Swiss-Prot record:
Source organism (scientific name): Rattus norvegicus
Protein name as annotated: Endothelin-converting enzyme 1
Keyword match Membrane: yes
Gene field: Ece1
Lineage, top ranks: Eukaryota, Metazoa, Chordata, Craniata, Vertebrata
Cofactor binding notes: Binds 1 zinc ion per subunit.
Positions annotated as glycosylated: 158, 179, 202, 262, 308, 354, 375, 531, 624, 643
Top-rank lineage group of the source organism: Eukaryota
Regulation of its activity: Inhibited by phosphoramidon.
Signal peptide location: none
Annotated Gene3D superfamilies: Collagenase (Catalytic Domain), Neutral endopeptidase , domain2
Classification via InterPro entries: MetalloPept_cat_dom_sf, Peptidase_M13, Peptidase_M13_C, Peptidase_M13_dom_2, Peptidase_M13_N
Protein purpose: Converts big endothelin-1 to endothelin-1.
Keywords in alphabetical order: Cell membrane, Disulfide bond, Glycoprotein, Hydrolase, Membrane, Metal-binding, Metalloprotease, Protease, Signal-anchor, Transmembrane, Transmembrane helix, Zinc
C-alpha cells in the first residue's frame, strides 16, 4: 500500500512562521524567542523575592516589556496564519473565465459531492445533453470526435496540390461515398453480382457452388469476414520480436454470446436481428418472406450454436492459460473440418505456408467443437451462414434502402433514434476507418502544433515518475519483483500524435501503393480496400513487428497500451480539449490527459499486462508471493465493481477488472504528478466563482471528462460487451478509493464517496 501525503493547507505548524518569502534572516523561531524572554528570570521563589525588591517604575517597565513581547508573538502568529492560509490569486483571463463557465454548466452544485460525485460533477451536463438523434450514447469523447470529423470533412473536400498520392486516394474514396446519385442508380446490383460470382446464395437464388472450403477461403481471404473463427497476424506474445499467425473464436452477428443464450432478456433484440436478416434478403432479391424467414431462422440458430461453444470474455483474462502454440499440421488434427493448408495459403498469398508453420491458438477446445459443429451441419446452411457474414459486412456500402434497414435494427439493438444524419458524417467515418493513415497527414498538419509532442512527452515523464514513486512504497510486492516492475516502467515506449512514416509522402505512398480507388464506385472501393488490407497483413507475417504500426489512426479520440511492444500510444485526436488545453490550469490538464496517460501506463501492470515483461514477452517474471498478493488486492476491486449496477443490471467486476485497475492507478499517478508539479512550480491561480481549490479542481476535471449519457439498450450492450465500467462508475469507483479525494472534499468517513474499506492495487 502506498504511503499517503498529509493534507495540504490543513492545520498549522507552530514551530516557525515565515514573513514573506523564505530566505536567510527571515525565519523567527518561537523556541528561541521564548528563551530570550526568560533571560534574567530566576526560579519562581527567587523571582518572588526579586519582584518585591523592585521599584514601582521597574515593575511598570517589566509589565510593559512583557506585554510588548506578547503582542509581538501575537502579531507574528497572525502573520504566519495569514501566510499559510492565504488564498491563491484568481485567474481572470478570457481562457479561465471560459473554462469556468463550461465547468459550472456541467455541474449540479445542489448535489453533495460526498454523496454522489458523478452527479455533482456532471448533473448539469446530463440535463443539457439528452442522447442526440442518430446516437445511442453521447459524451465528451463523442463531442470531440464530431469536432475532428468536421475538420476531416473540410480537408477531404478541399484538394491541395501538395497532397501525396495516398491522401488523394482517401479523397477519391470519400467522394465516391458522397456520390449518392450513383449509389442509388446501382441499388443492390454490386452485392448481387458479387454473390453470384461466389456461387450464389440459397436465400436469393439458385445455389450452384456446393464447396464449403472454396467459399470459406474466398469470403475470408478477399472480403475480410470471419465466419467460425478469426485469422490474423500479430506479434507472438512469447517471442515479441516475431509476428505469427493467430486463430481465435469469432463468427457471431450480435455483439456478445449473451444475446443468444439469455433469450428471454434479449427477445426484442433477437426478433429485431431476425427481421433485419429477412429485410436484407428481400432487398437482395430473395423473393417472398415465407421462403426467406425459415432459412434466416436457421442461420440464427446456427449462430446460437456457435454462441454456446464461445468462451465468455471474463474467462479469457489469463493469457498464460489461453496461449497455445501449435503447428499447421497439429491444427489440422485439432480441427479437421477445415483443410488448413489451402485455407492459410489463400489468406496469406504469396507467402508460402507449410505443415510446420507455427500458429498461436487462443482456445483449442473452441476450435475442436467448431470443427465438430461444421461436420454435423447441412452444407446449404453452412453456405447460407458464410454468405450472411459477407452480406452483413458489405450491405452498408449500398443504397438508402439498406441504410434504412441498418437504422431500424440499430434502433432495436442500441436504442438509436432514426434520423437523417448528414451523409458526410457516415462517409467521413468510413473513410477514416479504412484510410485513416492515408488522410492522417492532412489532419496532423491542421490540428497538431509542432511542440505538442514535446508537451505530451513532458506530461508522460511526470506521470511515469509519479507511478514509480508509488511503486516504491507498495507493501504487498517483494523487492525483486518491484525492481523488475520499475525496469518495465522505465522501458515503456511513448508514441505520440502519429506514426512517423505518414509525414513522409514517399513512405506513405509506398504503404498505399497497391490500393487504387475508383471515382464514383463506392462499393468497389470498399471491396478493394478489404482485399488490400489482407495483402498488407500477409506481408507482415515474415517481418518483425515495428513501432510505426499503430492500432489507431491519428484522428482517433482514444489511446492504448500494447503489451507486446510495451508502449503507450496517444493519437493526435485525443491531445485536445477537454483532455488538454494550453491555457487551462494544470489541475485540469493533469485531471484530463494526465489521467489518460496514467491509465494507459497502468495497463502495463493490470491483470493481463502484468504477465508481459519489459521486452513484451509473456512469461512468469513475478515471484509467487507477489502474484498471490496481487490477486488479493485485485479481488477487492472485483467485488467493489460487482456491487454497481445500471437499471438493475450488475456490472461484471471480473470482465472489467483490467480497465478498473487502470482507472484507479491512472488517477493516483496523475494526482501525485500534479502535486510534484506544484512543488516545483508553485501554486496555481484558482478559477473564479467556483470556490474550489486547485486540488479539488483536479478531481472535478477528471470526473467531467466522463460526463455521458446512454440509451437503456446501449447501457445493456455495454454491460455485457465493454471491458470498461460505465462512465458513472469509472468516476465513483476510482474516487471512492482515493484517500486524497476524501481529504480535499472533507467527506465524512463512511459516506458513499469515502467508504471505510477502500481498494488499492497500484
Amino acid at each position: 500500500m502506498g504511503s499517503l501525503r498529509p493534507p495540504q493547507g490543513l492545520g498549522l505548524q507552530w514551530s516557525s512562521f515565515f514573513l514573506g518569502k523564505k530566505g536567510p534572516g527571515l525565519t523567527v523561531s518561537l523556541p528561541l524567542l521564548a528563551s530570550s524572554l526568560q533571560v534574567n528570570f530566576r526560579s519562581p521563589r527567587s523571582g518572588q523575592r526579586c519582584w518585591a525588591a523592585r521599584t514601582s517604575v521597574e515593575k511598570r517597565l517589566v509589565v510593559l516589556v512583557t506585554l510588548l513581547a506578547a503582542g509581538l508573538v501575537a502579531c507574528l502568529a497572525a502573520l504566519g496564519i495569514q501566510y499559510r492560509t492565504r488564498t491563491p490569486p484568481v485567474c481572470l483571463t478570457e481562457a479561465c473565465v471560459s473554462v469556468t463557465s463550461s465547468i459550472l454548466n456541467s455541474m449540479d452544485p445542489t448535489v453533495d459531492p460526498c454523496q454522489d460525485f458523478f452527479s455533482y460533477a456532471c448533473g448539469g451536463w446530463i440535463k443539457a445533453n439528452p442522447v442526440p438523434d442518430g446516437h445511442s450514447r453521447w459524451g465528451t469523447f463523442s463531442n470531440l470526435w464530431e469536432h475532428n470529423q468536421a475538420i476531416i470533412k473540410h480537408l477531404l473536400e478541399n484538394s491541395t496540390a501538395s497532397a501525396s498520392e495516398a491522401e488523394k486516394k482517401a479523397q477519391v474514396y470519400y467522394r465516391a461515398c458522397m456520390n449518392e446519385t450513383r449509389i442509388e442508380e446501382l441499388r443492390a446490383k454490386p452485392l448481387m453480382e458479387l454473390i453470384e460470382k461466389l456461387g450464389g446464395w440459397n436465400i436469393t437464388g439458385p445455389w450452384a457452388k456446393d464447396n464449403f472450403q472454396d467459399t470459406l477461403q474466398v469470403v475470408t481471404a478477399h472480403y475480410r469476414t470471419s465466419p467460425f473463427f478469426s485469422v490474423y497476424v500479430s506479434a507472438d506474445s512469447k517471442n515479441s520480436n516475431s509476428n505469427v499467425i493467430q486463430v481465435d473464436q469469432s463468427g457471431l452477428g450480435l455483439p456478445s454470446r449473451d444475446y443468444y443464450l439469455n433469450k428471454t432478456e434479449n427477445e426484442k433484440v433477437l426478433t429485431g436481428y431476425l427481421n433485419y436478416m429477412v429485410q436484407l434478403g428481400k432487398l437482395l432479391g430473395g423473393g417472398d418472406e415465407d421462403s426467406i424467414r425459415p432459412q434466416m431462422q436457421q442461420i440464427l440458430d446456427f449462430e446460437t450454436a456457435l454462441a454456446n461453444i464461445t468462451i465468455p470474455q471474463e474467462k479469457r483474462r489469463d493469457e498464460e492459460l489461453i496461449y497455445h502454440k501449435v503447428t499447421a499440421a497439429e491444427l489440422q488434427t485439432l480441427a479437421p473440418a477445415i483443410n488448413w493448408l489451402p485455407f492459410l495459403n489463400a489468406i496469406f498469398y504469396p507467402v508460402e505456408i507449410n505443415e510446420s508453420e507455427p500458429i498461436v491458438v487462443y482456445d483449442k477446445e473452441y476450435l475442436r467443437q467448431v470443427s465438430t459443429l461444421i461436420n454435423s451441419t447441412d452444407k446449404c446452411l453452412l453456405n447460407n451462414y458464410m454468405m450472411w457474414n459477407l452480406v452483413r459486412k458489405t450491405s452498408s456500402f449500398l443504397d438508402q434502402r439498406f441504410q434504412d434497414a441498418d437504422e431500424k435494427f440499430m434502433e432495436v439493438m442500441y436504442g438509436t433514434k432514426k434520423t437523417c444524419l448528414p451523409r458526410w458524417k457516415f462517409c467521413v467515418s468510413d473513410t477514416e476507418n479504412n484510410l485513416g493513415f492515408a488522410l492522417g497527414p492532412m489532419f496532423v498538419k491542421a490540428t497538431f502544433a509542432e511542440d505538442s509532442k514535446n508537451i505530451a512527452s513532458e506530461i508522460i515523464l511526470e506521470i511515469k515518475k509519479a507511478f514509480e514513486e508509488s511503486l516504491s512504497t507498495l507493501k504487498w510486492m517483494d523487492e525483486d519483483t518491484r525492481r523488475s516492475a520499475k525496469e518495465k516502467a522505465d522501458a515503456i515506449y511513448n508514441m505520440i500524435g502519429y506514426p512517423n512514416f505518414i509525414m513522409d509522402p514517399k513512405e506513405l505512398d509506398k504503404v498505399f501503393n497497391d490500393y487504387t480507388a475508383v471515382p464514383d464506385l463506392y462499393f468497389e472501393n470498399a471491396m478493394r480496400f478489404f482485399n488490400f488490407s489482407l495483402r498488407v497483413t500477409a506481408d507482415q507475417l515474415r517481418k518483425a513487428p515495428n513501432r510505426d504500426q499503430w492500432s489507431m489512426t491519428p484522428p482517433m479520440v482514444n489511446a492504448y497500451y500494447s503489451p507486446t511492444k510495451n508502449e503507450i500510444v496517444f493519437p493526435a485526436g485525443i491531445l485536445q480539449a477537454p483532455f488538454y488545453t494550453r491555457s487551462s490550469p494544470n489541475a485540469l490538464n493533469f485531471g484530463g490527459i494526465g489521467v489518460v496517460v496514467g491509465h494507459e501506463l497502468t495497463h502495463a501492470f493490470d491483470d493481463q499486462g502484468r504477465e508481459y515483461d519489459k521486452d513484451g514477452n509473456l512469461r512468469p517474471w513475478w515471484k509467487n508471493s507477489s502474484v498471490e498478493a496481487f490477486k488479493q488486492q485485485t479481488e477487492c476491486m472485483v467485488q467493489q465493481y460487482n456491487n454497481y449496477s445500471v437499471n438493475g443490471e450488475p456490472v461484471n467486476g471480473r470482465h472489467t477488472l483490467g480497465e478498473n485497475i487502470a482507472d484507479n492507478g491512472g488517477l493516483k499517478a496523475a494526482y501525485r504528478a500534479y502535486q510534484n508539479w506544484v512543488k516545483k512550480n508553485g501554486a496555481e491561480q484558482i478559477l473564479p466563482t467556483l470556490g474550489l481549490t486547485s486540488n479539488q479542481l483536479f478531481f472535478l476535471g477528471f470526473a467531467q471528462v466522463w460526463c455521458s449519457v446512454r440509451t437503456p439498450e446501449s447501457s445493456h450492450e455495454g454491460l455485457i460487451t465493454d471491458p470498461h465500467s460505465p462512465s458513472r462508475f469509472r468516476v465513483i469507483g476510482s474516487l471512492s478509493n482515493s484517500k486524497e479525494f476524501s481529504e480535499h472534499f472533507r467527506c465524512p468517513l463512511g459516506s458513499p464517496m469515502n467508504p471505510r474499506h477502500k481498494c488499492e492495487v497500484w
